[in-house]
């Protein structure tokens, strides 16, 4: 699948960024990355991705705070956000959705889970 969509991956673990980037670039996406919430928010001043994949457990500013800030600003409130996290408790998932997450994937994850979530949100059909 060739696409001109851009996806931003935000995770403090460079290995996760590399894995996600490899999967998505293989599907034709342009992938940008940030290693923290503040870095993402700064990058969004100059460019808007089509979708954000966001870790929850990060230093400085956790992903839920980042999500809240994204959803509170008109410019970014409609950006689809997938939470990709090791937080697996029902309360964590529910909390993510209540703050405006569009999809929730727990680690460890498969490429199929990731691509299907993106396809669902970007209307790209099946992988």
Region locations from a protein language model:
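Charged docking surfaces used in two-component/phosphorelay signaling
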Residues: 18-26
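Receiver (REC) domain active-site loop signature in two-component systems and cognate sites
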Residues: 58
């Amino acid at each position: 699948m060739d696409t001109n969509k851009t996806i931003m991956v935000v995770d403090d673990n460079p290995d996760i960024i590399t894995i996600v980037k490899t999967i998505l670039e293989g599907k034709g996406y342009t992938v940008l990355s940030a290693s923290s919430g503040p870095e993402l928010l700064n990058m969004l001043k100059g460019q808007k991705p089509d979708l954000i994949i966001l870790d929850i457990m990060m230093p400085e500013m956790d992903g839920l705070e980042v999500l809240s800030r994204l959803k509170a600003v008109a410019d970014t409130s409609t950006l689809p956000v997938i939470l990709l996290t090791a937080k697996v408790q029902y309360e964590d998932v529910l909390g993510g959705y209540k703050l405006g997450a569009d999809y929730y994937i727990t680690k460890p994850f498969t490429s199929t889970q990731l691509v299907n979530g993106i396809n669902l949100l970007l209307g790209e059909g099946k992988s």
